[in-house]
Amino acid sequence: MTQINENYLKLKAGYLFPEIGRRVKAYSDANQNAKIIRLGIGDVTLPLAPTIVNAMVDAAKEMGSAGGFHGYGPEQGYSFLIQKIIAHDYTARGVQIAEDEVFVSDGSKCDCGNIQEIFSLDSKIAVVDPVYPVYVDTNVMAGRTGEVGPDGRYANIVYMPATEENNFEPDFPKEKADIIYLCYPNNPTGMVATKARLTEWVNYAKKMGSIILYDSAYESFIQDPEIPKSIYEIPGAKEVAMEFRSFSKTAGFTGTRCAYLVIPKDLKGKTKSGEEVSFNSLWNRRHTTKFNGVSYITQKGAEAVFSAQGQVEIKEQISYYMENAKLIREGLVKAGYTVFGGTNAPYIWLKTPRGLKSWEFFDELLGTAQVVGTPGSGFGPAGEGYFRLSAFGKREDVISAIERIQKM
């Protein structure tokens, strides 16, 4: 009989969001008249902006003509989109990025999960705790993490706790880590990193010979002009960091699928013999081998995001979600909850009341208020006793959810 990859058996039972779905379904089946409000998974609710839709319609019509048909495109992405990405997201901030340093993909989740393939299995990873589960689970699948202990932590992962005590600003790894995962604005805590703190991270990575995997999927929600939107705003970051970006939350592409990864050519690793190798070239080889590229229609829609009218429309949507965040945050504070995040990110991180465990509060919130959120413990051991609410709901649902919570 063919053997399996036993690393999959090391995964904790059930991915966080399917488990939420299972519990919600069980409750819904037993309470069919319940009006459940979902503020859990970070899926957007507003439709695609008109400028994006029009661009995709035009692209679809192009594809229906002999002269405008596009078959396989460049796996790394079409130049028309990459040039807009560079001009808007980097050149405008004084950062120089070359076209062949940008890789367009169908989502940051895929990129964050797949990037570990170009690192040695001996590489030690460090993650902030609580953490987006994909960073950990994909390394478990690869065989890099060892076994999970009774405390929920994997033996070969360096955990960097982000707690109320350290203002959710984790200390540097206590032992050398080859790969450091950072996410700002942070999922799940909603916190951000200042320029001074990011500078410290870049300097630390240089000193230790580490690589930072910087997940910047929520940068468009930053309201404070003093907070960096890209790690490359920090001098020297191109020598130590890769950056993950997404159109999912920025422009409502959760169902359309488009993102990009920046890997500077200055970013190098080494072989066992000490030879330097470009991570850019390794990823290019991996990307072109395993990925056929994002569709032409989708990339034309993404290009429209950077048009003048496209920017107006997506900023209106971002403002809508951030107003939701404000309503959630203020409503929870009024109800007596201890709350974090929600000012430069679409996530609100709250302390569970009465010392409840995260899943206990999940069940209480669902059973009493018919509101669904995300248990903090699902993001790691340091998330126990916390809970995440998302600002991506419809306004009327957000208002109703807060009213229900305040009555609990």
From Swiss-Prot:
Gene3D superfamilies: Aspartate Aminotransferase, domain 1, Type I PLP-dependent aspartate aminotransferase-like (Major domain). Its EC number is 2.6.1.83. Substrate binds at Y15, G42, K109, Y132, N187, N292, R388. The keyword Ribonucleoprotein does not apply. InterPro entries: Aminotransferase_I/II_large, DapL/ALD1, PyrdxlP-dep_Trfase, PyrdxlP-dep_Trfase_major, PyrdxlP-dep_Trfase_small. GO terms for molecular function: L,L-diaminopimelate aminotransferase activity; pyridoxal phosphate binding. Pfam families: Aminotran_1_2. Its cofactor is pyridoxal 5'-phosphate. Keywords: Aminotransferase, Pyridoxal phosphate, Transferase. Disulfide bonds: none annotated. The modification N6-(pyridoxal phosphate)lysine is found at K249. SUPFAM superfamilies: PLP-dependent transferases. PANTHER family: AMINOTRANSFERASE. Involved in the synthesis of meso-diaminopimelate (m-DAP or DL-DAP), required for both lysine and peptidoglycan biosynthesis. Catalyzes the direct conversion of tetrahydrodipicolinate to LL-diaminopimelate. This is LL-diaminopimelate aminotransferase. It comes from Leptospira biflexa serovar Patoc (strain Patoc 1 / ATCC 23582 / Paris).
